[in-house]
Amino acid sequence: MKLLLDTHAFLWFIEGNQNLSLTAKNAIKSPTNQRYLSIASLWEIAIKVSIGKLEICMNLTELVNREVYGNAINLLEIQSQHLDTLAALPFHHKDPFDRLILAQGLTEKMPIITKDNLFANYPVTLIW
């Protein structure tokens, strides 16, 4: 199964953070699942690092090479179809990064691994 990780799920996974649910952790670790991280998540991480809301112990290139590719996570590029879905989404969720991740999950028919309760307002499969 193809799975799309929300930004916090990815960060908690690579940190070994106990906030990541066992169900989410097992889904990410399962060798039968294909894991994806949106480019939007990397953009969100870069912005949060630059404004001091997030600290990571490596630069973004190292993060991608070590933690994304090193954990066999695929990067999901932003496609025009994702933007069409994004434009049609109702505004239950205001966060632009989460809205794009939602649009990608919907377009690609991928369950999203997230703790964010607002995602439940959309017709997407959630894993937590």
Predicted regions and their residues:
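Short, basic/aromatic-enriched C-terminal tail that caps enzymatic domains
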Residues: N117-W128
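Alpha-helix capping/helix-boundary segments
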Residues: A9, S41, H82, I101, ...
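Short, well-structured N-terminal submotif of metal-dependent ribonuclease cores
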Residues: M1-S38, I51-R66, E108, N117
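Active-site neighborhoods of divalent-metal-dependent phosphate/nucleic-acid chemistry enzymes
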Residues: E55-T61, G70-K115
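Generic structural signal for small/hydrophobic residues in well-ordered secondary structure
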Residues: T7-H8, I45, L86, G105
